[in-house]
Amino acid sequence: MSSQQYQQQRRKFAAAFLALIFILAAVDTAEAGKKEKPEKKVKKSDCGEWQWSVCVPTSGDCGLGTREGTRTGAECKQTMKTQRCKIPCNWKKQFGAECKYQFQAWGECDLNTALKTRTGSLKRALHNADCQKTVTISKPCGKLTKPKPQAESKKKKKEGKKQEKMLD
């Protein structure tokens, strides 16, 4: 290798080395120049807790509906708002559409009142609804009801009738 080639290679190496140092210095100063964001200050609000009305179904007595919320406070930006809600259609409405109860089996028939009763304990309340812890319901004793015939029992009856016709 000639001295001229050697010097040329050395200059290239020195230029690359200086470029690397320059890039590292630029990156370091860019990171140092960034300001750390101060944590957001938590505002202590004068606003009170939201108080929600009961869910009012859009149509019928269950399904989708709306509820209104209000809160108090001198410096509140929003004191009223409307929220979507849903009333399950399989819940017993007489205890409040937002209260779900777990019921025990029906009790024995009371001959004096001709009613049988059962109690339910609160299983779930939607949207902080005001629900009773336990409820009691009554219904007339009435006749003993037979369970509805299942599809299988209908098939058995049909097969039995077919056999009777064949024997005739």
From Swiss-Prot:
One of its GO terms (molecular function) is carbohydrate binding. Keywords: Disulfide bond, Growth factor, Heparin-binding, Mitogen, Secreted, Signal. Residues 147-168 are annotated as: Chondroitin sulfate A binding. Residues 139-168 are annotated as: Disordered. Pfam families: PTN_MK_C, PTN_MK_N. Phosphorylated by NEK6. Residues 92-99, 123-131 are annotated as: Chondroitin sulfate binding. The keyword Transmembrane does not apply. One of its GO terms (cellular component) is protein-containing complex. It is found in: Secreted. Gene3D superfamilies: Heparin-binding Growth Factor, Midkine, Chain A- C-terminal Domain (2.30.90.10), Pleiotrophin/Midkine, N-terminal domain (2.20.60.10). Residues 1-32 form the signal peptide. One of its GO terms (biological process) is response to xenobiotic stimulus. The keyword Lipid biosynthesis does not apply. PANTHER family: PLEIOTROPHIN, PLEIOTROPHIN FAMILY MEMBER. Secreted growth factor that mediates its signal through cell-surface proteoglycan and non-proteoglycan receptors. Binds cell-surface proteoglycan receptor via their chondroitin sulfate (CS) groups. Thereby regulates many processes like cell proliferation, cell survival, cell growth, cell differentiation and cell migration in several tissues namely neuron and bone. Also plays a role in synaptic plasticity and learning-related behavior by inhibiting long-term synaptic potentiation. This is Pleiotrophin.
